[in-house]
Each structure stands twice: as structure tokens, then as C-alpha cells.
Amino acid sequence: MIDLFAIVNKGGIVLWKKTNSLVNLKCLQVLFHEAFLSEQRTVNNTVTFDRYTMQYQEATQYSIVFVVVFQDLKCMAYSQSLLNSAHNIFLNLFKEKLEDRQVPNEAEVEKLFAPIFNRKSAQLENETDTKSLPVEANNDNSARKKNEYEMKKKGAQSKQTNAPKKGKKQLRKWDDQITEEEQAALNYSSQASSASQTVDNSQLSSIVGNNNKFQKTGSGDVIISDLEMDPNQTISNKSASSAFSLFSNLIGGKYLKEEDLSPILKQMQEHLTKKNVANSIALELCESVKASLINKKVGSFDTVKNTVNKAFRDRLTQILTPSTSLDLLHSIRSVRKNENRPYTISLIGVNGVGKSTTLAKIAYWLLSNNFRILVAACDTFRSGAIEQLGVHVKNLQSLKGSSIELFAQGYGKDSSFVVKNAVEYAKQNSFDVILIDTAGRRHNDQRLMGSLEKFTKATKLDKIFQVAEALVGTDSLAQAKHFQASLYHRPLDGFIISKVDTVGQLVGVMVGMVYAVRVPIIFVGIGQTYSDLRTLSVDWVVDQLMK
């Protein structure tokens, strides 16, 4: 049985999906990276990730991709037929709408497409079950094919069976995802001698943290796991203990009126505010949901609670889902290949939000992808700022040797001058990425924010990310707006939310910041070690808000 079938547009939005088992939705992100963003081409429209095999078929003219995900290799016998059928059924049903450059909504797909698809899927599965894969005891070709199936299933997870040579330390495997042998970036570098290390091996381990959150794709890229409560967690539709118990007293089979919704939406607004969503945004969110539900008929098989639950989830997902690609690795490689210059990333933010630590985490991840990193120390005012960066760089050198360096020109220098010199140095020494640390500044201090505008105007940066704390309340909105306004004729490129591990379910600040300036969350920080960096799972955030 297939584990997941999904219809996804090229923007990464899931139009419709059917799951038959718990599936880590990270696999869809990996598929899009491998199939459409990576320079390496996929073979037979197939991508492997973790324990999953993914096959896809694209309706190129409409930018729609049909995806089937499975673990049981028997599914390979009919997966392509299922994709072909799904492709033809979907285009026949919605051709007129697609020709008008419209996309059917989930309800339309569920009503028209799902019944036909389910019958076809069951038919193909039953036909496969009546047959067995041809295995002949004396047929070498059959045995070879069977072995190929087994190797494909294991993929990058296949284990070394040869015993290590005597006297050599046995290499460690990190939850079947990345080995030290495959990814030297995630362990002690052979280039750094023990004499030059600033910390011993036991200290290095505590600094690095839990590396199994970094996962290796088929093309060799090391990607960061989504923020989830558990690495195997999948998104649940449970709502018994959620805020939507507020709607249990409404009866199905009626047209919803404003008087039905207003009292309960007021309670919902209070619930969101308690989750750290700014009051103004919680109010606007509730008003938006109310407008979408008034005069909507709720059938007897579609409870009011589920209807309102879905409306809130859809709106929150719309707010948090990025409208552009967040594939930083692809952007870096594109600039290096096409423009032959270092890629520049600057971190900005108020004092004390963890910019230096966040920069070190990003550096560690980029080093794991074999980029050469130059760290530019542009906080030339805060006492000890350069030394703090120096500690991080020395630690990372202990892990990766000369692949990372610190560029510093002392205190009191103009940050724009330092960046200009850093870029020249990076060009001369073949660095791939420059990570720029900047001075912390109060967002309501016009003098300090004015210097940020001067810095942005004088330096042509590829990305500017604002680092912000998860637990700052409604002040986060003011921070986001002021930093956005202080950049010279360009928007912020994204947020990095630090200290998310300290807020539990109070994740509403993320909604507020994204909503305030319409830029996405690139990463979230969940601790102090170099591997405590995650990408945002929109579904996870919505689940936390709705609990």
C-alpha cells in the first residue's frame, strides 16, 4: 500500500493529499529540492529519502506535480500506472479551470477527483496483490533485480558490513542518516591537529549537539530537519482537546450566521492572544475566518467544529507558507556558478537575541555542505563582540580545519568598510559564503537604525535575515516593522526565530512577525549547540496554536 499520494503545485502548496500511514512530510520538501532545484537530474522521476521512495509526474503546462510515496517496494509494480491515471483523471476533470489559470480548491478535488482515484488505487493494489514478484531460485537475473530492490529501499541508509581494521576507531552512525565517513563535516576534521584544537573531543561533542537532525539527500546535500516535537512526528488532525471544542454547541445542517459565530470567535481571539499572537492580528484573523464562513451551509456529515477548524488552519497556513523558494543551498551555488563571487548573508536584530550563536549554527550547517565560510566581524562597537565570534570560529575550525576563517579589523571601524574589505578578501581566497555579524540595535533608536540604512545602502548583500526572539510578545511586531523600514530600498529576506525551545506552545510571535512584514521564517533556533537549528514546519506551528 502506498503511504502518501499528493497533488502539489510548483510553489510547494499541497492541493490535495491522501495518507494511508504516518508519513514525515519532510519527504515532499526533499523531492522538490532533488527534482526541481538541484543541478543533478533524478533517474526515472524517482527520489529516495530516509526509508521512503518517491515517484512523481509533472503536468508541466499547469505547474502541477503528482507524487506517490511508499516504503513497500511492491508498490513499484503499479506506482507509475497510478501516477498516469491520476494525471489523466485530474486534467480531464479540471481542464477548463486550469486553462483559465485557476486551481481547484481542496473541496472540489475531494468531491470530484478523490472517489475516482480511490477506486483506481484499490484496483491497482488488488491486481498487484494477486501476483508476486518473479523470484526464481536459479535465475541470476531475478536475484539481481531483487537485490536492486533491496538496495534502493535502503538507499543512503545501507550499512557497512565490513569489520573495521584493527586499531581503528569504529565510525559512528547517526540514526541511519549521515555517517562520519560520508560527511566529515559533521565530525572532527583530519585537517585540524589535536594540538590546534581549542577544545577536546568530549567538549566538541557537547558543542555540536544532536547531528541526526541534519539529513543527507541523495544528491549529497545536508539539509536541516523541520521543527517538530519528535523527529518521527507527523501532523495530527486531533481536535478533541483543541480550541475548537468551543464550537461543539453549534449544530450541523444549517447556514452559519454572524450571531452564531461572533461569540465563539471572540473566545478564539482570546485563545490566540494567550498563544502570543498579537491582539490586533488575532482579531483580524478571526474576522477573516468569520467572513469566509457566514452564509456557509454546514452539512450533517461535516460538523461545524471541523468546518471552523479547517478555516482557521487554512488561514494560518496561508500566512505562514512562503511564497518564494527558501532553498539557500541552491541560491549560493547559483551565485558561485553564474557570478563567480562570494554569497553574502547579514544578520541583524536587537541586542541579546543570539545573533552570534545563530551565525555559528548557520556556519556549521554550510560547512557540512562543503562550503568555505568567511565570518565578517562587523559589530565593531560592543566590547567583546569580535572575541565572541573568534571563539565560535576556533571551535568550528576544530571541526572543519581551514574551511572557515574570521575576518576582523578591530573596533571602531565603519561596518560598511569592513564588509567591503571582507568581500575582496573572500574573492582572493575562494570563499563561497560571507556571514556578516552586525551590531545589535534598539529598533526605536533612530540614530542606530539610521546607521543600518547606511550600511545596507553601501553594501550589496544577497540576504538580510533578522534574528528575533520567540518570547518577546507584541514588541516583535514593532521590531519587524522598524527593521524592514530601515533597509535601503529593499525588504528583509526572512526571519530567524531564536529560543523557540523556551516558549512551548506559545508560538504566536511567528505568526505576528510574518503577518506584519510579509517575509518568511527561514530557520528557528532551539538551543545553544551548533546543530540546534531547524526549518519551520507550518503544520507544526498551526497545531501548537490550535491546541
UniProtKB/Swiss-Prot annotation:
One of its GO terms (molecular function) is ATP hydrolysis activity. Signal peptide: none annotated. It is found in: Endoplasmic reticulum membrane. GO terms for cellular component: cytosol; endoplasmic reticulum membrane; nucleus; signal recognition particle receptor complex. Residues 343-546 are annotated as: NG domain. Keywords: Endoplasmic reticulum, GTP-binding, Membrane, Nucleotide-binding, Receptor. Transmembrane segments: none annotated. The NG domain, also named G domain, is a special guanosine triphosphatase (GTPase) domain, which forms a guanosine 5'-triphosphate (GTP)-dependent complex with a homologous NG domain in the signal recognition particle (SRP) complex subunit SRP54. The two NG domains undergo cooperative rearrangements upon their assembly, which culminate in the reciprocal activation of the GTPase activity of one another. GTPase induced rearrangement of SR drives SRP-mediated cotranslational protein translocation into the ER. Belongs to the GTP-binding SRP family. Heterodimer of an alpha and a beta chain. This is Signal recognition particle receptor subunit alpha homolog. The lineage of its organism: Eukaryota, Fungi, Dikarya, Ascomycota, Taphrinomycotina. The gene is srp101.
